[in-house]
Amino acid sequence: MKRLPLLVVFSTLLNCSYTQNCTKTPCLPNAKCEIRNGIEACYCNMGFSGNGVTICEDDNECGNLTQSCGENANCTNTEGSYYCMCVPGFRSSSNQDRFITNDGTVCIENVNANCHLDNVCIAANINKTLTKIRSIKEPVALLQEVYRNSVTDLSPTDIITYIEILAESSSLLGYKNNTISAKDTLSNSTLTEFVKTVNNFVQRDTFVVWDKLSVNHRRTHLTKLMHTVEQATLRISQSFQKTTEFDTNSTDIALKVFFFDSYNMKHIHPHMNMDGDYINIFPKRKAAYDSNGNVAVAFVYYKSIGPLLSSSDNFLLKPQNYDNSEEEERVISSVISVSMSSNPPTLYELEKITFTLSHRKVTDRYRSLCAFWNYSPDTMNGSWSSEGCELTYSNETHTSCRCNHLTHFAILMSSGPSIGIKDYNILTRITQLGIIISLICLAICIFTFWFFSEIQSTRTTIHKNLCCSLFLAELVFLVGINTNTNKLFCSIIAGLLHYFFLAAFAWMCIEGIHLYLIVVGVIYNKGFLHKNFYIFGYLSPAVVVGFSAALGYRYYGTTKVCWLSTENNFIWSFIGPACLIILVNLLAFGVIIYKVFRHTAGLKPEVSCFENIRSCARGALALLFLLGTTWIFGVLHVVHASVVTAYLFTVSNAFQGMFIFLFLCVLSRKIQEEYYRLFKNVPCCFGCLR
């Protein structure tokens, strides 16, 4: 028994459980029986608190300030323990996803993280930055703080964060409780700091950072920045107390503001001239002026951001490397904005805005387009529009425009259609109407050439196949040309259009060759010729489409329409064969008209020359539509686009099926007789066919 105290002391030193198992008072599952300080009892495990017998509660380490995870980390409590994880945009210094504070791990910024795609990360960064600058009350000091933090080493997260900070702080960038002279001085200082700060986000050095954003994110945040700049500069300008004309600039942005009262309205002409770019506003003329009103006008000049707002992702390309591969609209000028505020609002109503902007790239081939950035202040989604703007003058280096509204203006270089919105809508309606009428007429032609046995011949066989090919081409065009939401389906539609239109051209070529053989009097084997006609009419287009698809299948279907892309001149896989057939048919057309005119004049010498010419002209007009030579207007439109060529091409080819029906069926004596036999027993039709 004398050894028992020594054994207890030895067991305590080793922190071992004594042989007794606390049988009288059993321990809870999260506790164990131990001897501490010579006392045997139930003790809660680490991470739990209680007496070990009746209660052992989980400790909330995340609520314990001594156990907090530190800055830029979130704490998660678990049963008996906890762990820390860095917030999005940061990583642990130990490169482990989970850690605890006592192992020395901290969260550091992850510069390679795609935080700009994570709203949680953006919100966390904004809140963190706002916490740092919330105590800054003076606008100039606030802008200086943003400038210092954004002057170098920007990430996409930083750009988005500071744009949001500027947007949220723009309402603070004004002065209300200062003296008149102090207000004007402070407004000047604020505008200067504001321009210097915004320059950090729009200078060319930041383009590589903007490139890391998706197209939608880039446009949205850039729109928000421009909107914030417009609103903030106008708000600061309204703080002036006396007539003011103030300008300031940085490397890639310039600002000019005007503030004046109604007494000076006749003498102040708001304008801006920067690097040869000029903008001027013209108010509506009034007989009398309100003596109590004032006007603030703000011009903002963005030197370099145009490529960021182009429709292409390849905005990092230098202007001379632009490849107008599809129907794109690239900004080839600076972007200049004008905003205005008058009190009362009717004091200074706008009549028009004129501006002249220089081209960053010489545009000798593609047309210039006056445009403005049309966006929603609610969603900050925007796109270029030309509504309300018209081009007044343009050459290779400059373009002048006139608009009837305020916003951000620029000059676009467009490889798309050289027609206005109004003409485009009219041409669209003409195309739809013409194709519907042509489909009906072509269906009647197919029925006529297929089922009237009395008129069957080589010529009607060619007519029938031409009508079938053209019918299918126009049907696919009408149904599928604009179904570009699914890339695969759009590519299939483009491939079908490519084949059927080439097949139609092939049969137009066969029409020309067959007419030439008849007129010249060549004797041929009908069976052999029929076989080769079918091979040429249907197999040769398949070969062209097959080779084209094998070499450039990704060029079938564009982002706008389901047709061939102009990228890498892929469109010439259609234009090339079409032009060759048009050339062959034009030569055949010339020979046919010449032979027919001489033959008619020789048979009927008593008929006047005028009558012969008129007779040949009718036949020539029919041949123009039958041989597809009206497609020459399409070639002219590609070479030298204009509204005239657009209308000529649209009308002549959308209604091609109708003209074929008129010339081949309605005006044909033999087919008229067949129609008469078919409908003579129908009471409603007998009178009109008699």
Curated annotation (Swiss-Prot):
Induction statement: Up-regulated in tumor endothelial cells. Up-regulated by DLL4.
Tissue expression: Detected in the majority of epithelial cells in tumor and normal tissues. Expressed also in human umbilical vein endothelial cells.
UniProt-annotated location(s): Cell membrane
GO MF assignments: calcium ion binding; G protein-coupled receptor activity
Segments of this protein annotated with the region GPS: 370-419
Protein topology in the membrane: Multi-pass membrane protein
Pfam families hit by this protein: 7tm_2, EGF_CA, GAIN, GPS
Ranges in the topological domain labelled Cytoplasmic: 454-460, 521-532, 595-618, 668-690
Every GAIN-B domain range: 244-419
SUPFAM superfamilies from the UniProt entry: EGF/Laminin
Membrane-spanning ranges: 433-453, 461-481, 500-520, 533-553, 574-594, 619-639, 647-667
CDD domains documented for this protein: 7tmB2_ETL, EGF_CA
Quaternary context: Heterodimer of 2 chains generated by proteolytic processing; the large extracellular N-terminal fragment and the membrane-bound C-terminal fragment predominantly remain associated and non-covalently linked.
Family of this protein: Belongs to the G-protein coupled receptor 2 family. Adhesion G-protein coupled receptor (ADGR) subfamily.
The protein's role, per its UniProt record: Endothelial orphan receptor that acts as a key regulator of angiogenesis.
Domain notes: The transmembrane domain is not required for cleavage, but it is required for dimer formation.
Name by which UniProt lists this protein: Adhesion G protein-coupled receptor L4
